[in-house]
């Protein structure tokens, strides 16, 4: 299985980089996982609705450029479906069973994802109704992917 995490914005925090590196190392025996960082669109502090839409659209074009036609796309969005770790593990297992070898998780910037990215997504996933920093979501997502592989293989970890 090839998993891509496509994310807007450059990760600056050392502690997040270390956590991400650790989970990428752990995941290497289960799947090929890559994190693709795309530049965020520079924008002033107080944007109008129209300006926010333009920023999301520009970031969306960058995201869509990284997704091939045969990729199953899962958008991380606050309005997405919430799943338990076991349900998430089951859904990853089902994707593999049905021959979906390329999966891309998409994490938008601080303004979220464009309409076009949401249309391209096969499903939408939410980790919480709370707003979380998009940089932190990379680490949380990698941990949950790792947990899912451990659950699916019946290996200890997730309790």
Curated annotation (Swiss-Prot):
Binding-site residues, S-adenosyl-L-methionine: 76, 108, 127-132
UniProt KW Transcription keyword: no
InterPro entries: Alpha/beta_knot_MTases, RlmH-like, tRNA_m1G_MTases_N
Enzyme class (EC, first level): transferase
Record text on subunit structure and interactions: Homodimer.
Family: Belongs to the RNA methyltransferase RlmH family.
Function: Specifically methylates the pseudouridine at position 1915 (m3Psi1915) in 23S rRNA.
Annotated protein name in UniProt: Ribosomal RNA large subunit methyltransferase H
The species this protein was found in: Bacillus cytotoxicus (strain DSM 22905 / CIP 110041 / 391-98 / NVH 391-98)
Top-level taxonomy: Bacteria, Bacillati, Bacillota, Bacilli, Bacillales
């Amino acid at each position: 299985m090839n998993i891509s995490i496509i994310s807007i914005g450059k990760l600056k925090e050392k502690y997040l980089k270390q956590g991400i590196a650790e989970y990428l190392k752990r995941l290497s025996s289960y799947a090929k996982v890559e994190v693709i960082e795309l530049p965020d669109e520079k924008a002033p502090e107080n944007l109008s609705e129209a300006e926010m839409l333009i920023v999301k659209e520009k970031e969306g074009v960058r995201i869509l450029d990284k997704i091939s036609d045969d990729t199953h796309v899962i958008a991380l969005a606050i309005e997405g479906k919430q799943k338990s770790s076991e349900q998430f593990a089951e859904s990853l297992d089902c994707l593999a069973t049905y021959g979906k070898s390329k999966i891309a998780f998409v994490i938008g910037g601080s303004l979220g994802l464009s309409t076009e990215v949401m249309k391209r997504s096969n499903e939408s996933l939410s980790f919480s109704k709370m707003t979380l920093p998009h940089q932190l979501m990379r680490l949380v997502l990698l941990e949950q992917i790792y947990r899912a592989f451990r659950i699916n293989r019946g290996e200890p970890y997730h309790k």
